[in-house]
Amino acid sequence: MSRQVFCRKYQMEMEGLDFAPFPGAKGQEFFENVSKQAWQEWLQHQTTLINEKRLNVFEPEAKKFLEEQREKFFNNDESVEKAEGWKPE
């Protein structure tokens, strides 16, 4: 049986991640409070942001921007960035 978590994005019990997505306290927080589905959706959204905004993920400004967007995404904040011209299917 898969591990269940109360997903902070969807506000319901869902299948959890298999492991923390990155080391440290923040990674553990996502492991405990984000569903596998929500994490996959974030990875897709992050990839879109990186490509459309031509971010260099090695630059501190880009890392900070993505961290801020990740928090907004999982908190269902309306101000999360969308790629220009992007329309959800």
UniProtKB/Swiss-Prot annotation:
Q: Which Pfam families match?
A: Iron_traffic
- Annotated InterPro entries: Fe_traffick_prot_YggX (IPR007457), Fe_traffick_prot_YggX_sf (IPR036766)
Keywords of this protein's UniProt record, alphabetized?
A: Iron
User: In its UniProt record, which GO terms are filed under biological process?
Assistant: cellular response to oxidative stress
Q: Which domain of life is it from?
A: Bacteria
According to the UniProt entry, its GO molecular function terms are: iron ion binding
Its Gene Ontology cellular component terms are: cytosol
| Family statement | Belongs to the Fe(2+)-trafficking protein family.
Q: Which HAMAP family match?
A: Fe_traffic_YggX
Role this protein plays? Could be a mediator in iron transactions between iron acquisition and iron-requiring processes, such as synthesis and/or repair of Fe-S clusters in biosynthetic enzymes.
From the Swiss-Prot or TrEMBL record, give the protein name.
Probable Fe(2+)-trafficking protein
Q: Which organism is it from?
A: Acinetobacter baumannii (strain SDF)
